[in-house]
Structure formats: structure tokens, C-alpha cells
């Protein structure tokens, strides 16, 4: 084959550091635009950026010429600095992302569901904690959790977890 064909959709999640201030609702839409702009600068196509006061979901295509971790670090770093420069209520130094992030592959056939899931973050988090959301996504994408959870903890979590209380199956 003479040409490389590449299209990898990624559902990424950034969460604020435990000592960080929450994302100000007054800055939220501008902040999402800034995050989108930074992904585009990295050669990514962005489908949606949306989140909640403590985390942000991004659905984008990965640039085949860059490692994912470089894209994520760049966007986290620049967007963190942008937020710090625009948050006049709490002080510039009080907003910080966690260094860790989540990144899941999304097939073209699952794009509509992933987009819907991200678009409806406000509704989802009325009934679901961030950590339950992450655990569900990890299970859905078969992420190995054995280092962080015992089998008993996972069985307990699986028995109580259900998306039925959200009103629609999102993923």
C-alpha cells in the first residue's frame, strides 16, 4: 500500500486537580472554545467539547504524526494557562488539571452515541458521579482495573451500577 490511511476518533477526559477550583460557569463556553482551538492547532478534528464543573470531555481525531500523550499534554498545559489568565474571581494560580487523563477509542459507528453522551453531561451528572462515569467507561472499553480495584470491589460496583436512572442508554 502506498498511502497510509488513518482516522482514529478519541474520547478524552480531563479532570481538575484535587486542589483546583471548579470551572466557572461564566468561563465555561469560552474555555471549551479554547480547548477546541488547541486541539485544532495540533492537527486534530474536534467533534465536541463539553463537560461539567470538574471535568471536560473531548471527542476528536488524533493527528497521526503526534503521539497521543504529546497532544494531551499540550492541550492541558495551554488550556490551563488560558484559564488561569481569565479567572479573575478566584485567582490565576488556583486552576489546575490533573496530569492523568482518560482516552478511549471510538468507532465511526459509535460516534453518534459518544457525541450524545458528551452533549448531555449536565443531565448525566445529575444522577451519576464522575467516578462512576469513569468506571463505566473503563468497563465498556475493557480497561484493566486490577491494579486499582479488587475483584470484590468491582463486583460490588457492577451490581449497583446501571445507566437506567439516566433515562437513556448512552454508550
Predicted segments, located by residue:
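Basic nucleic-acid-binding interfaces
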Residues: 1-171
Amino acid at each position: 500500500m502506498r498511502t497510509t490511511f488513518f482516522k482514529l476518533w478519541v474520547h478524552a477526559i480531563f479532570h481538575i486537580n484535587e486542589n483546583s477550583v471548579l470551572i466557572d460557569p461564566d468561563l465555561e463556553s469560552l474555555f471549551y472554545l479554547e480547548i477546541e482551538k488547541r486541539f485544532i492547532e495540533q492537527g486534530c478534528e474536534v467533534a465536541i467539547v463539553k463537560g461539567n464543573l470538574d471535568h471536560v470531555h473531548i471527542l476528536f481525531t488524533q493527528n497521526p504524526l503526534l503521539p497521543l500523550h504529546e497532544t494531551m499534554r499540550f492541550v492541558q498545559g495551554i488550556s490551563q494557562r488560558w484559564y488561569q489568565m481569565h479567572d479573575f474571581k478566584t485567582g490565576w494560580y488556583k486552576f489546575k488539571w490533573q496530569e492523568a487523563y482518560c482516552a478511549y477509542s471510538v468507532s465511526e459507528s459509535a460516534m453518534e452515541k459518544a457525541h450524545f453522551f458528551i452533549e448531555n453531561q449536565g443531565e448525566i451528572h445529575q444522577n451519576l458521579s464522575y467516578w462512576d462515569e469513569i468506571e463505566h467507561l473503563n468497563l465498556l472499553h475493557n480497561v484493566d482495573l486490577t491494579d486499582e480495584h479488587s475483584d470484590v470491589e468491582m463486583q460490588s460496583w457492577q451490581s449497583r451500577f446501571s445507566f437506567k436512572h439516566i433515562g437513556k442508554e448512552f454508550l
